[in-house]
């Protein structure tokens, strides 16, 4: 499967449009992940997102795919607004952060329930978006005081298996490590599946 191969044969036909919604707890790194991938920059200032949409093109097997990337708010006060983002979604990426164990717990206790309500059968990708903090001394000290620890790879992988995610991936938006792989190995692979299966798996919010 050629993701970024030669341009020979490209430009033929109309682009295939696919929608990807990114969800997860507030401050878990969703916006930074999208900013680094689509715009190439990381901001140190945290500003809660209400709603934002990105468009990014890539080639899959010489087919131009236009990804519509939807960044959503994780706070409870935006639950109703966020539910409107799920219409006609092909892939949902659930993000969590290793420095906030609750964000991983909420993948199963909150986000999966919401997704099953609005998008039953949609393809899932689980992403740890701040893996650089796993061994951060300040983070380790803070969590130790609360009697907990940073989420480990095996824990994230276990959650991914239980929610039947298509992929589990880790990245560091701050250091731009693994960001492209998240999109090319995660979304692109699932997107290829949805292309070959037609529109199956997309959501309809009533």
UniProtKB/Swiss-Prot annotation:
The superkingdom listed in its UniProt entry is Eukaryota
Question: What is the annotated localization of this protein?
Answer: Cell membrane
According to the UniProt entry, its GO molecular function terms are:
GTP binding; GTPase activity
Q: What GO cellular component entries does it have? A: plasma membrane
Q: Where is the lipid attached (S-geranylgeranyl cysteine)?
A: 203
Q: Which UniProt keywords apply?
A: Cell membrane, GTP-binding, Lipoprotein, Membrane, Methylation, Nucleotide-binding, Prenylation
Q: Which residues form the propeptide?
A: 204-206
Residue list for modification Cysteine methyl ester: 203
Q: Name one GO biological process term.
A: small GTPase-mediated signal transduction
The name on file for this protein is GTP-binding protein Rho3
Q: What PANTHER family does this protein's entry cite?
A: RHO FAMILY GTPASE (PTHR24072)
Q: Which family does it belong to?
A: Belongs to the small GTPase superfamily. Rho family.
Where along the chain is GTP bound? 24-31, 71-75, 129-132
Q: What is its main location?
A: membrane
Q: Where is this motif: Effector region?
A: 46-54
What's the protein's topology in the membrane?
Answer: Lipid-anchor
């Amino acid at each position: 499967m050629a993701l970024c191969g030669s341009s020979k044969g490209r430009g033929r036909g109309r682009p295939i449009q696919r929608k990807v919604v990114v969800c997860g707890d507030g401050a878990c790194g969703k916006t930074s992940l999208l900013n680094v991938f689509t715009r190439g920059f990381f901001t140190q200032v945290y500003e809660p997102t209400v709603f934002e949409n990105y468009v990014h093109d890539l080639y899959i097997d010489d087919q131009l795919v236009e990804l519509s990337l939807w960044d959503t708010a994780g706070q409870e006060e935006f639950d109703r607004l966020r539910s409107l983002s799920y219409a006609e979604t092909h892939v949902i990426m659930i993000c969590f952060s290793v420095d906030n164990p609750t964000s991983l717990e909420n993948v199963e206790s909150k986000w999966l329930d919401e997704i099953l309500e609005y998008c039953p059968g949609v393809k899932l990708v689980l992403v740890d978006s701040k893996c650089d903090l796993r061994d951060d001394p300040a983070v380790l000290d803070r969590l130790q005081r609360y009697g907990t620890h940073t989420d480990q790879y095996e824990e994230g992988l276990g959650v991914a298996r239980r929610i039947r995610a298509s992929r589990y991936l880790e990245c560091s938006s701050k250091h731009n490590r693994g960001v492209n792989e998240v999109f090319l190995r995660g979304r692109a692979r699932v997107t290829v599946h949805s292309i070959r299966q037609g529109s199956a798996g997309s959501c309809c919010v009533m």
